[in-house]
A protein has these predicted regions:
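The feature marks the mature, well-folded catalytic cores of soluble enzymes
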Residues: 2-236
Length: 236
């Protein structure tokens, strides 16, 4: 079998067909290679994975290093803290993904913030006119200061975390905090659409002039929430 066998007999021989045909032809002459086991004895984390307080501090530090605005609070303070962030931002409209706990936004709604539930029909243009979005997350990685969303309850479509200019994300600690990426992957469903967020959207030109908000939210605020009465909260 030659590359030409994979090209439409009556169609033009364009570069795409030519390249794919050559690849198929080359693979056809290659003997099947047995799958080899991968070594799994590598270091999976550079910090103790069993120290929740240390992981929380590391996550806080790395999130802030990426220029996210990080806040800590107890669970019973969460509605008030979310309302405070939205009011301080001047937000009058906020997108609410399906499955977000209703109690999180009761204080904001009482302050006159309009809640826009997302049923999947909000267009990018409509989302661009919204002031803020509030979401939960699937987990957060302490070593890299990364938050992972997987479109689960309270997280919404990927579009929600990319279009609004202000993203408030809630991370439940310690249960949603892992030490490293290798420890995060087994907890994630590989077939779900994942969005990995390390700080607000930013890019730099050739002279390293940083511009934020080009590919996503200009402002990322993260609330690290600990169960009421827990000791791992340092007010911020």
């Amino acid at each position: 079998m030659t590359a030409s066998d994979h090209i439409r007999p009556n169609g033009p021989r364009n570069s795409r067909e030519l390249v794919l045909g050559r690849i198929r032809a080359a693979l056809g002459d290659t003997a099947e290679v047995a799958e080899q086991p991968l070594p799994r004895d590598y270091l999976t984390a550079h910090v103790p994975a069993d120290d929740p307080a240390a992981l929380l501090d590391l996550l806080h530090h790395n999130l802030a290093d990426y220029r996210a605005l990080v806040h800590r609070c107890h669970e019973d303070e969460l509605p008030r803290r979310i309302a405070g962030l939205l009011i301080e931002r001047g937000s009058r409209t906020v997108v609410v993904p399906a499955g977000l706990p209703a109690a999180w936004l009761t204080a904001a709604e009482a302050e006159g913030v309009e809640l826009l539930p997302d049923d999947g029909t909000l267009t990018a243009a409509r989302l661009d006119a919204v002031d803020s979005v509030v979401t939960g997350c699937a987990l957060a990685v302490a070593e890299t200061g990364t938050i992972v969303l997987d479109a689960g309850p309270g997280q919404g479509r990927r579009l929600l975390s990319l279009v609004p200019d202000h993203h408030v994300c809630v991370v439940r600690t310690p249960e949603q905090v892992v030490a490293s990426v290798p420890l995060a992957l087994p907890r994630l469903d590989p077939v779900r659409p994942q969005t990995w967020i390390s700080g607000p959207s930013a890019t730099s030109d050739i002279e390293l002039d940083r511009v934020e908000g080009v590919h996503g939210p200009r402002t990322l605020e993260v609330l690290l929430v600990t169960a009421t009465g827990a000791d791992a909260v340092t007010p911020a």
